[in-house]
Amino acid sequence: MPYSLTEKKRIRKDFSKLHSILKTPFLLTIQIGSFLDFLQMDVPPGKRKDKGLHAAFKSVFPIKSYTEYAELQYSSYHLGVPSFEVKECQVRGLTYAAPLRVKLRLVIYDKESPASEQVVKDVKEQEVYMGEIPLMTPKGNFVINGTERVIVSQLHRSPGVIFEHDKGKTHSSGKLLFSARIIPYRGSWLDFEFDPKDCVYARIDRRRKLLATILLRALGYSTEEILIMFFETISVKRQGSSYLLDLVPQRLRGESLPFDIASPDGEVIVEAGRRVTARHIKQMEKAGMKTLPAPKEFLIGKTLARDLIDAGTGEVLAKANDEITAELMTALEDANIQAFDLIYTNDLDRGSFISDSLRLDPTTTPLEAQMEIYRVMRPGEPPTKEAAQNLFQNLFFNPERYDLSPVGRMKFNRRLGKEDITGPSILSKEDIVDVIKTLVDIRNGYGSVDDVDHLGNRRVRSVGEMAENQFRVGLVRVERAVRERLSLAESEGLMPQELINAKPVSAAVKEFFGSSQLSQFMDQNNPLSEVTHKRRVSALGPGGLTRERAGFEVRDVHPTHYGRVCPIETPEGPNIGLINSLAVYARINQYGFIETPYRKVVDGKVAGEVDYLSAIEEGQYVIAQANAAADEEGRLIDMLVSCRHKNEFTLLPPEKVQYIDVSPKQIVSVAASLIPFLEHDDANRALMGSNMQRQAVPTLRAETPLVGTGMEQVVARDSGVMVVARRGGIVDSVDAARVVVRVNDEETASDEPGVDIYNLIKYARSNQNTCINQSPLVKPGDTVAIGDVLADGPSTDMGELALGQNLLVAFMPWNGYNFEDSILISERVVEEDRFTSIHIEELTCFARDTKLGPEEISSDIPNVSEAALSKLDEAGIVYIGAEVKPGDILVGKVTPKGETQLTPEEKLLRAIFGEKASDVKDTSLRVSSGMQGTVIDVQVFTRDGVEKDTRALEIEEMELAKIKKDLRDEFRIVETDIYQRLEKVLVGKTVEGGPAELKAGTQITQNYLADLPRERWFEIRLRSEEAGRQLESVAGQLKEQRVAMDEKFQQQRAKLTSGHDLPPGVQKMVKVYLAVKRRVQPGDKMAGRHGNKGVISTIVPIEDMPYMEDGTPVDIVLNPLGVPSRMNIGQILETHLGWAAKGLGRKIGALLESGEQASELRVFLDRIYNASGKKEDLNSLSDEEVLELANNLKDGVPMATPVFDGASEQEIKTMLELADLPTNGQTNLYDGRSGEAFARPVTVGYMHMLKLNHLVDDKMHARSTGPYSLVTQQPLGGKAQFGGQRFGEMEVWALESYGAAYTLQEMLTVKSDDVNGRTKMYKNIVDGDYRMEAGMPESFNVLTKEIRALGIDIELEQD
């Protein structure tokens, strides 16, 4: 495979042995694919599938009026174009959404015609606006009110039927109580359960339980029908004084009968009282016994299967399910009943559960049963016949109230063993009976219960599906209103637009995207955190679990997680196991189940075919691991192969294997697949490692890890933070803010411009206040192909993910500074800005309309010194580039204040300075404490009709100039292309005449055209009519392009100059962006990729750091005790390999310095790249490319060791040897302060370290005087509130134990909530008097009030 533009600049040495046959899929498909299915935007209305918006409309429409003479039908819908681009929405604080227009048809029927064959009287069709639908950006997130949000997929219980037992927890005897539950997609849940006495009960929506037979009766079944459905029958015929029973020999197994069993010829097979064995049964079958003579007594206690009626009198002698007694037998004999049926039950595997339940059942008719159900569902309401029937009908048999969904129906039918997996979305009588039958079978010992946590019983609801459900909710609300108004439609001649109010729909959609539990603020720390957030699968949320209720089993790793959900990446804490991450290759099928790919294995040979299997399908196959040994042709060569079958690991011969894993990294998620040597780390630490990578702050200069896994490129590409070429071509121009590409002719469609302009994002703020900045990688003249990286984004380096920095690390103790995982770093790391990051704070100032008049943004602020206003322009807004510190004014603002009684001093001031000083107060936006930085951008938003200030106009001008430049460049390139094509047409043509004394009959030359100004080319008159027409068409094309450019410019101008949509009451809004540069400092949290985290304890001068024999000081010192107990040995292997990578880079640098030719470099590079692992095709590179590659490798040869398929110990040693480094990875270090060697060799090497977003600057906080709580008058807590430190119970004990009474009193009164005391204290300190008078704490008053609230009068007696 040829290298891309960036790949060939720096090739990663890959140690993988297994050739990956399946490319890593696009990582955001789960989001983007789901939402595209929901919108079906580019599908013509006639061809739309029954899902998403289309399905929602179809499920609610047509809406009929109550009289059924008017009907509103749905025809189709289309989505308009969003008013603003994604970027504009973010700046203006708007939602990126498209207007939805629906074509509706109002049909009015003739009232005279009969209802059966209605005659259409009138049809009106109209497009109706139905609100706005938020659109997904190409990166898979949404912009809601200007902030980027992600809709997390939900893992919920699949609809269908599930059988389980209580594990013996309900009853004290430990008896297993079985239950079945029918879960619909929407509608009432139906449960069936056994009680300890073995009767079957039903519950609807977890209400009070009622007998299952009541439900069966409500469905219209009689006692007799119920018995015949659930039991086999035994026919009994009377023969003299004894009775003949139908004999099925198998039924007698294990029984002991009170009489002899004899064959027809009189031979006794089983004696009375003996147990019947399999041998006896064989003898009976051999003897051909069809009936069994039994005495009358044997039948007593058995149960009748059918009603017995005296044929002569019509009298009912016995009812179905009656137990036979001696009296009944006599009555039957008297009535001369010759034959009757019994139900067949036994204690072993034919329980009489339904029969027992029927005996307890008080109801006899369907209506009585329905009334009983009504009483349970609506307790306290008197039931009527209609109400009871309607309620029961609506519970499970009304498509509007109950929906199993195609998934539910498929799961339901599969579980009950039906062939056909399709069917109605409501339940049928047969469905309910089948479920009870299966439940009884399981209780009887046939079949087994289901595993609730099996991924075949849990499905994923993605964005599209959840949005569709919300949309349907909105439509149902609209439907009620429409139905009311439809009756007016014909009399008042209304149109569809007047019938529909789109508010409820847009409100439902807005609520879902804005405030649903699964609509989350996007984690935008770095590209990886964005990707993982979009691939997250949560079991929480509406219709899911809650943290408190979720038990251990739900959270645990399940065998079906293999290849579907990552067993490693999940949060620590209360959400552990409830929030998971999709595995790298996993995808979601049409039913919402997670599938994972496997390669087919036929007769022990791996085929090229790849099949995706869901958890249900996977169980029946034998699946080998990706690393199973195979020869060149793909034959499995081991005698026994490690396989998975039915969720268990086992060893089987190769010919039994049916599938094999696609890749070793199949089982882990994206974040875990970025950890090198993951196979050498303990799972708990790997979990921390994958979670901490998501918290890494993008550094000023990204540095790709020396030891990676090969997934870095995939994550960076799919995250969308880099600029990737949309079409191939040649780079025309590059600057820091944009890249212009002249597109190849063959990739340009006729209606598209032949130029792509990529505007780069410069210093934008992310959701986490980190900095998003893109910088170009290409040079003018470079040839780029589609998909090539043109510019790096945050935390990417040459198209690869780069979350941290490679540091030279030593594992050794150093003066106790690395106690308890502390980290010691060298001053050089700070000096070189290795971990310096830029954070961008957004500060907003509103100018509102108040009762006393409008607030004003200006630089004329009362009682403020000139120095304080020095950073503001005349409009009162800080200028860009200003360095600001806490307390500085960013936006000057004054608010009118009411007239107050003036003090003599104020009167004097007023007399001197005039009116202004008093009627407004200063409410400027100031820099808050603990924040300082540089102003990098200012945005001014003005409401329509409010005059724009000078600053707003300036910003507008700059934006317009930018747009103009882009359009001009686009036009310039298009124009050049047109003229080049025209030149080909004109050169060599014979002319009639033309400008610059061109004579008729002469031929046009290139020189002539070069001298003639381009715009005059069109004056040339050609002899050939065909060529003349071509000339005219080109002139037309140019004119069109010019007009199009002007139009585009006017549109953009109109957008820019229009007023902004601001919240009510806001006249003007100013946003100021501050860039804060944060160097690494003690207290910052750092970590590696293996869960090895720590806090920086101190920064040591370079000269004091331990140094190696060649004088190189190390960058960072880690505690060796952090490794053995944590069992994350991956970090040590990474350190060794990183050292080798750096050493090889140094050797390449030396070769370059000594002026070696490309051929020598090729030899050395070949030794590195092709000694082991994946082979690289260095011959495809030209000599210049080899030199450029070598130059990029000087700082270290990047290596890739994919998870579970990485570098072996031997390969690491080989690399160290090649780099002329000790193969044990250790070297002698010398103390930087004394110069003496340390006692033993130390493990040294390069490790990729991350700076996490837990910075000491964000946590450090001190309070002087600040806000107090309203009720208790105690200081608030926390940095956000500028709060104080709580002096708690244990702190009080500490002071008590020292007897520091006055300090204690001060703490509990004046420093806390003694309002008068603290005011007095303040005055005393100002007067230089340091005495303290403690008063009554406010919390004491609160206590007295609370005691009074209990009805106890309490008051303080004053002396």
From Swiss-Prot:
S-S bridge residues: none
EC class (word):
transferase
The record's Gene Ontology biological-process terms are: DNA-templated transcription
Q: Which GO terms describe its cellular component?
A: DNA-directed RNA polymerase complex
Alphabetized, the UniProt keywords read: DNA-directed RNA polymerase, Nucleotidyltransferase, Transcription, Transferase
Q: What is its EC number?
A: 2.7.7.6
- The residue ranges crossing the membrane are none
The catalytic activity, as recorded, is: RNA(n) + a ribonucleoside 5'-triphosphate = RNA(n+1) + diphosphate
PROSITE patterns from the xrefs? Answer: RNA_POL_BETA
Sorted alphabetically, which InterPro entries does this protein's record hold?
Answer: DNA-dir_RNA_pol_bsu_ext_1_sf, DNA-dir_RNA_pol_bsu_external_1, DNA-dir_RNA_pol_su2, DNA-dir_RNAP_su2_dom, DNA-dir_RNAP_su2_hyb_sf, RNA_pol_bsu_bac, RNA_pol_bsu_CS, RNA_pol_bsu_protrusion
How this chain assembles, per its entry, is: The RNAP catalytic core consists of 2 alpha, 1 beta, 1 beta' and 1 omega subunit. When a sigma factor is associated with the core the holoenzyme is formed, which can initiate transcription.
Q: What does this protein do?
A: DNA-dependent RNA polymerase catalyzes the transcription of DNA into RNA using the four ribonucleoside triphosphates as substrates.
The record's family statement is: Belongs to the RNA polymerase beta chain family.
The protein's name: DNA-directed RNA polymerase subunit beta
Q: Which organism is it from?
A: Nitrosococcus oceani (strain ATCC 19707 / BCRC 17464 / JCM 30415 / NCIMB 11848 / C-107)
What are the top taxonomic ranks of the organism? Bacteria, Pseudomonadati, Pseudomonadota, Gammaproteobacteria, Chromatiales
